[in-house]
Design a protein with these regions (language model features):
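Extended, Lys/Arg-enriched charged tracts that mediate electrostatic binding to polyanionic substrates
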Residues: 136, 175-187
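Terminal catalytic/cofactor-binding subdomain
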Residues: 1-116, 145-162, 166-167, 190-201, ...
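A short alpha->loop->secondary-structure connector
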Residues: 140-143
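Short, solvent-exposed loop/turn segments at secondary-structure junctions
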Residues: 73-75, 120-122, 138, 183-185, ...
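Histidine-centered divalent-metal-coordination microenvironment in nucleic-acid enzymes
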Residues: 119-136
Length: 300
């Protein structure tokens, strides 16, 4: 580790998020919803998918889901503000559609449309809340960066997990867990975002000078409503990336079975559950986050 705080790079980082919203409509068949959402007033742009005035994009994703992508921000506070704006745009869109139906039929629909930041629907299909971080191209993404940051991703649910109810395998009763999207994740990393369902997508599209920058595209995290949880998601991940970019060793925190550890941590709201590191030490999610916070504090 480095002893001088000035050795760790400090400064703004470009980051952004993308959210595929789930729309609940109990007035019509679910399978024709995408076509009707496409006609919402919020989509009446000159060209579907163009940028909005605040630099964001609101469009229909390849999976037919309405998606809001924030503009590029220079820090976690900017992402929080941009996500809140996105929530208001989506909410205004569904409210406009409800009013349009009432005007057309002369009778208000019995049940209003509702938009949710929900990543797994009742059929078990997953949607995405994606995080994007611009990082310096100093090390190999798959061989160095992913192993170093995975323990952070697997344990950060203690402060940024959205939570979910899952049936207990023993008695079938619903149990509260700390994560939602994580139950549908199949690998820590992959270049195939839809078939392998990775926590990190290896697609490297920095949209910047590619010899200097790369993009970390995180697809396995949860979506949050609470501003502090959104901020913590991006601020903590950016801080850990600073450690990695500066060459600080995090190998003692690498987990033996990352996805298993994530689910073990998430299944215990008391935060006492442990998982084994590659060095044979049993650690809790809180142990990992405390160790990362200590190293950030020592070096920033």
């Amino acid at each position: 580790t480095m002893s001088s705080k000035t050795q760790l790079e400090i400064g703004p980082r470009i980051m952004r998020s993308e959210m595929e919203y789930l729309i609940h409509d109990l007035n019509h068949a679910v399978n024709d919803l995408p076509d009707r959402f496409y006609c919402y007033p919020a989509f009446n742009l000159k060209s579907i998918g163009e940028f909005l005035e605040n630099g964001s994009r609101f469009y229909r994703d390849v999976h037919e889901a309405p998606e809001y992508a924030t503009p590029e921000c220079l820090g976690a506070r900017g992402v929080v503000a941009a996500e809140i704006v996105g929530e208001k745009i989506v909410q205004a869109s569904v409210e406009s559609e409800t009013l349009r139906r009432a005007a057309r039929t002369k009778v208000p629909p019995p049940k209003p449309l509702r938009a949710f930041k929900q990543l797994i629907d009742i059929e078990g299909k997953t949607r995405g809340h994606h995080e994007n971080y611009l990082i310096r191209r100093k090390a190999d993404l798959k061989m160095v960066i992913i192993p170093a940051i995975t323990s952070h991703f697997m344990s950060r649910s203690i402060f940024c997990g959205a939570g979910s109810l899952r049936k207990d395998t023993k008695d079938g009763k619903p149990r509260f867990t700390l994560i939602e999207k994580g139950w549908g994740i199949e690998s820590t990393d992959s270049s195939a975002s839809t078939t392998k369902k990775p926590y990190v997508n290896l697609r490297d599209e920095p949209h910047a000078a590619e010899y200097t920058w790369m993009r970390l595209h995180v697809t396995g995290g949860d979506a949050n409503i609470a501003p502090w949880a959104i901020w913590f998601t991006f601020a903590s991940t950016s801080a850990v990336l600073r450690l990695i970019e500066s060459g600080i060793d995090l190998s003692d925190l690498e987990l033996e079975s990352p996805l298993h550890a994530m689910r073990v941590f998430a299944s215990d709201p008391s935060l006492k559950a442990t998982a084994r590191t590659i060095r044979g030490k049993n650690v809790t999610a809180l142990n990992i986050q405390e160790a990362l916070a200590e190293r950030v504090d020592q070096n920033i």
